[in-house]
From Swiss-Prot:
Catalytic activities: adenine + H2O + H(+) = hypoxanthine + NH4(+)
Alphabetized HAMAP family for the sequence: Adenine_deamin
Family the entry assigns: Belongs to the metallo-dependent hydrolases superfamily. Adenine deaminase family.
The species this protein was found in: Jannaschia sp. (strain CCS1)
Protein name (record): Adenine deaminase 2
Pfam families given in the database record: Adenine_deam_C (PF13382), Amidohydro_1 (PF01979)
The encoding gene: ade2
Lineage of source species: Bacteria, Pseudomonadati, Pseudomonadota, Alphaproteobacteria, Rhodobacterales
Any one GO molecular function term: adenine deaminase activity
Length: 623
């Protein structure tokens, strides 16, 4: 048998996999020399949760060919690396992450998180999917094909669109999901099913679309990720599990976690509640953590630069009382098993990608080196590899399609003739009540006015897909600027990602939205009639193709300008809603459960944009 060169091994392809593994067999037997012998002081076998002393890992191409006691390998190698003082653990994985929330493109995301041990990510891709659904898979695989060592396993978004009352950018059903799963083995399944009321209501206009995507995923035995926010009663938890929705990352209490765990859900713990959850579960006597993973979900590059990536989540779990070994299992073998990716990632074992994290201290998860694809890619927190140069095409960079200048009149809310006041429907950020708030607001010059004395300002959604700039506007309570002629606008508005704006004057709102149109997305801040800060997200209106430090500098400048503004604030049910610069308004535009009344861009089913997504009922914003 002649020795044939292995395939490039960037993406998982069945035919290539056979050739790769045929070669790995020969390397493991010593018939063909390995590329590198990496000898370490200790190695964590995550299958048994046992430490093995003085081990060698034989690397061949991008994979592991052999693991065993030092000196046991029967063949030769081209290179020798000996790290007797370091401990080897598998590359860390993200079971559920929106890379878009880092706001850097995948090639820069790799440079950002690989020094923190994050070698693979299951990308919950409904953000970019909602901007450009047809190019979704191409977008997520481009960086890997260009040479990035990070593995991205996309899960096409079920929330495309998030509800039947939103449109533009992408529309996924059975045909699209079947196509993605047939196109690439990198596709791990179906991204979080968020509109769960539609799953068990045949009258909901999203019912057939969602079940079509579920069917297509079952056909390929893919994983169907869940999003069970607001589900706490036993009947609904059972219905959620019965639908085949396999996981949840939205639990807020220990009791809720246990109720969902006992119905078979895979539980994904997020950092903001992780410590409390781990402590509560330990107090409850939980011993088997095999049905748990740690997940980031959303984290900006600014926060990653400050606190870390997956390694930060592991440290939180350890500080809450978990052993380091269990915490590491929760970012390696556990998520790999759940996502059915164990032949490729999740452990230091033959056939897997040669993704290895070398620690010099276990309790603090101090990372000395990170190996990926069989090469050293990061050391002492520094990324060592060149960044692939990707010239993102127009389908990725020309996505804020507003083909005219927005005017103050676009944000006006007219009053009925002869009225001094109008009844107005209001929302707060993260308003999950069954009904909206009602107030009487003053009328001036034929338009309904804000009332800053009562913490009332104006909020708007601008369609960025049709080119027409169709706008819906209403009054919101407890957010936005009190400073005159001031507005904030952003093109990341989960999950449809139309442009949103909040402002103390219609003219300032128009100025901020026009600035976003000019830079093709990001943030724009107008203070007292002047544009004072912008942050550019030119890729999808969600990300930038620039170094994370450069983006962070722009964000810090935005925050600094934001500190000069008097921001309204009232608490809501969300524990993650804080006073000051209202960055989390980007999440306050969500339309999935437990939201009821929401504001969306004008659509056929919601012509004025104000709709109850649970019932389909619409209502005027003033009357």
């Amino acid at each position: 048998m002649t020795d044939q060169p292995a395939p490039t091994d960037h993406l998982i392809r069945a035919a290539d996999e056979v050739k790769i593994r045929q070669r790995l067999v020969r390397v493991a037997l010593g018939h063909v020399a390995g590329d590198t012998r990496l000898r370490v002081g200790k190695l964590l076998d995550v299958h048994s949760r046992m430490w093995l002393s003085d081990q060698e890992i034989i690397l061949s191409g991008r994979r592991i060919a052999y693991v065993g006691p030092a000196g046991s390998y029967p063949g030769g190698v081209a290179h020798e690396v000996h790290e007797p003082d370091l401990m080897a653990v598998p590359g860390f994985g993200e079971v559920h992450k929106h890379i878009e929330s880092s706001h850097v493109t995948p090639e820069w995301e790799a440079a950002l998180v690989l020094p923190h041990g994050n070698t693979w990510t299951c990308e919950a891709s409904h953000e970019f999917s909602n901007v450009n659904g047809p190019h979704n898979l191409e977008f997520w695989l481009t960086a890997r094909l260009a040479g990035s060592p990070q593995k991205i396993f996309p899960l096409p978004g079920s929330a495309v669109p998030p509800t039947a009352y939103e449109w533009g950018g992408g529309h996924f059903g059975y045909d699209e999901q079947a196509g993605f799963l047939n196109e690439s083995l990198m596709v791990a399944g179906l991204d979080e099913v968020m509109d769960w009321p539609a799953v068990w209501n045949p009258e909901n206009p999203s019912y057939d679309r969602l079940w079509g995507m579920i069917e297509a995923t079952f056909e390929k035995r893919g994983v169907i990720e869940g999003h069970a926010a607001g589900i706490r009663d036993m009947a609904t938890i059972n219905a959620f599990a019965a639908a085949g929705l396999a996981s949840d990352h939205e639990a807020w209490t220990t009791e809720e976690v246990l109720d969902k765990l006992r119905r078979g859900l895979f539980m994904e713990l997020r950092p903001h509640s992780l410590s409390e959850m781990v402590k509560g579960l330990l107090e409850a006597g939980l011993e088997d953590w095999g049905q748990f993973a740690l997940t980031t979900d959303d984290r900006s590059c600014s926060d990653t630069l400050k606190m870390g990536a997956t390694d930060h989540n592991v440290r939180l779990a350890i500080s809450a009382g978990l052993s380091p070994e269990v915490a590491i299992q929760m970012v390696t073998i556990n998520p790999a098993r759940h996502m059915r990716l164990t032949p490729w990632v999740g452990s230091l074992a033959p056939g897997r990608f040669a993704d290895i994290v070398l620690l010099d201290d276990l309790p603090s998860v101090s990372i000395r080196q990170v190996w990926a694809d069989g090469e050293l890619v990061a050391e002492d927190g520094t990324y060592l590899k060149p960044i692939p140069k990707i010239d993102w095409p127009d389908w990725a960079t020309q996505t804020v399609k507003i083909d005219r200048a927005m005017m103050a009149d676009d944000f006006a809310i007219p009053a009925k003739r002869g009225r001094d006041t109008m009844h107005a429907a209001l929302l707060r950020p993260f308003h999950w009540d069954d009904d909206f708030i009602t107030m009487d607001l003053p009328v001036k010059d034929g338009q309904v006015q804000r009332d800053p004395r009562r913490n009332v300002t104006k909020f708007a959604i601008v369609d960025r897909f049709s080119g027409e700039g169709k706008t819906s506007a209403m009054f919101w309570l407890g957010t936005g600027p009190r400073t005159s002629d001031t507005a904030l606008a952003c093109s990341m508005g989960h999950d449809k990602h139309n442009v949103w704006a909040v402002g103390s004057s219609d003219a300032a709102m128009a100025m901020a939205v026009n600035a976003l149109r000019d830079i093709q997305g990001g943030w724009a801040l107008v203070r007292e009639g002047q544009l004072v800060a912008t942050v550019r997200y030119e890729v999808g209106g969600l990300m930038t193709c620039r170094p994370p430090a450069e983006l962070d500098a722009e964000m810090q400048a935005l925050y600094a300008e934001g500190e000069k503004i008097d921001w309204m604030y009232e608490p809501t049910v969300s524990p993650r809603w804080f006073p000051g610069f209202p960055e989390r308004l980007a999440f306050a535009t969500l339309t999935c459960a437990p939201w009821r009344w929401v504001l969306v861009a004008p659509s056929d089913r919601a012509p004025d944009g104000f709709v109850n997504v649970a019932t389909g009922q619409t209502h005027p914003v003033v009357w």
